């Protein structure tokens, strides 16, 4: 984990056509090649690239920003210039007795960042442990888990705006965060995030461990250390344990994490479903809405471990789609499995499921679901 920000500028490196293979650059391990790939080590390299963009036939193709590849579904052929932000560094920008402000470059691995902050005694991100991907992609989805969302700790985002070719510092309000949503997600290929600012607290007694099995597992960690209450580190380790038990490692079994969003439905619809399915899992939301566990819906529809080969749901977590033929399966096969699952769930519960990972079209533009809650 680096501790100082990169500042030296070197020319961005462009890969030639015959090596622009992105099959190993997406955690779903879908077969994909791109016209060219540009690796960005610092912000100056992007400025340099954009100064040439559009002025030469080599730079006349659409742009597509690819971070860690953990939340995307890539096409077999991507007819675009792929920009890969790989800026590295973590820097403390301000610190008091109660909090610390840090600035993290986009290329830092997210889980490594969580481990680093907890080890330093900086808290707030521990519930987001073991989420795959890089820090620069985290604001796009407003990643969340176990009662915490990224926006809870985020102060600002430094991002390049392609239409105006200018840099912007966006506050959390400017980012227009929602459930797994942000301005960056709604305006795809418009922004490239280079760094993210967080405010973390230093109170080791302040934890959020009431979600699911976290409290029980975290309390077990605390008791082993003769503590009466779990610390943020206990919560982090508990969540790591739980996620490792429920979610497959993409390096062992390719996947892109939770494939379907938990749908949000009206309270009266949820109450009606409860009469037929008393065990249905739901969580209260504002405005008399209920967030329903998509994994439960898929499992109750008889699809745990089901799908259309080689894309099937995971045996331990129906919310996750896995790829049984790494680097060979294509986006079209994912589409077939997704359609089968969403149609089956809708026929049984009349609840539409929305895909969480980003669907990338052949020209680098973003595709959207027909089912939206």
Curated annotation (Swiss-Prot):
This protein's name: UDP-N-acetylenolpyruvoylglucosamine reductase
TM annotation in the entry: none
Domain of life: Bacteria
Gene3D superfamilies in alphabetical order: 3.30.465.10, UDP-N-acetylenolpyruvoylglucosamine reductase, C-terminal domain, Uridine Diphospho-n-acetylenolpyruvylglucosamine Reductase, domain 2
Species whose genome carries this gene: Psychrobacter arcticus (strain DSM 17307 / VKM B-2377 / 273-4)
GO cellular component: cytosol
Cofactor: FAD
Catalytic reaction annotation: UDP-N-acetyl-alpha-D-muramate + NADP(+) = UDP-N-acetyl-3-O-(1-carboxyvinyl)-alpha-D-glucosamine + NADPH + H(+)
The protein's role, per its UniProt record: Cell wall formation.
SUPFAM superfamilies named among the record's database cross-references: FAD-binding/transporter-associated domain-like, Uridine diphospho-N-Acetylenolpyruvylglucosamine reductase, MurB, C-terminal domain
Subcellular location: Cytoplasm
């Amino acid at each position: 984990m680096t501790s100082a920000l990169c500042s030296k500028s070197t020319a961005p490196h462009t890969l030639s056509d015959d090596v622009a293979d992105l099959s190993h650059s997406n955690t779903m391990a879908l077969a994909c090649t791109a016209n060219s790939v540009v690796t960005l080590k610092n912000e100056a390299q992007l400025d340099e690239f954009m100064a040439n963009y559009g002025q030469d036939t080599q730079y006349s193709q659409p742009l597509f920003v690819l971070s860690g590849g953990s939340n995307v579904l890539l096409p077999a052929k991507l007819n675009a210039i792929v920009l890969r932000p790989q800026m590295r560094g973590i820097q403390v920008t301000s610190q008091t007795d109660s909090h610390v402000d840090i600035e993290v470059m986009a290329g830092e691995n997210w889980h490594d960042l969580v481990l680093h902050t907890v080890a330093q005694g900086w808290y707030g991100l521990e519930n987001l442990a073991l989420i795959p991907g890089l820090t620069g992609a985290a604001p796009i989805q407003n990643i969340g888990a176990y009662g915490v969302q990224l926006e809870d700790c985020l102060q600002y985002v430094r991002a390049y705006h392609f239409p105006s070719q200018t840099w912007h510092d966006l506050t959390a309000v400017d980012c227009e965060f929602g459930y797994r949503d942000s301005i960056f997600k709604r305006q795809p290929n418009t922004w490239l995030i280079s760094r993210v600012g967080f405010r973390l607290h230093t109170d080791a007694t302040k934890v959020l461990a009431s979600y699911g099995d976290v409290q029980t597992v975290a309390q077990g960690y605390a008791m082993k250390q003769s503590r009466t209450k779990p610390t943020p580190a206990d919560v982090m380790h508990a969540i790591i344990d739980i996620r490792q038990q429920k979610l497959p490692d993409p390096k062992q079994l390719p996947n892109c994490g939770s494939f379907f969003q938990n749908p949000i439905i009206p309270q009266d619809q949820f109450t009606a479903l409860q009469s037929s399915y008393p065990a249905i899992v739901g969580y209260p939301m504002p405005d008399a809405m209920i967030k329903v566990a998509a994994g439960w819906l898929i499992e109750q529809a008889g699809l745990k471990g089901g799908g259309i080969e080689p894309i099937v749901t995971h045996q331990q977590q129906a919310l996750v789609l896995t790829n049984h033929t790494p680097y060979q399966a294509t986006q079209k096969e994912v589409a077939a499995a997704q359609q089968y699952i969403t149609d089956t769930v809708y026929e049984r519960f009349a609840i539409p499921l929305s895909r969480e990972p980003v669907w990338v079209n052949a020209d680098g533009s973003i595709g959207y679901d027909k089912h939206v809650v």
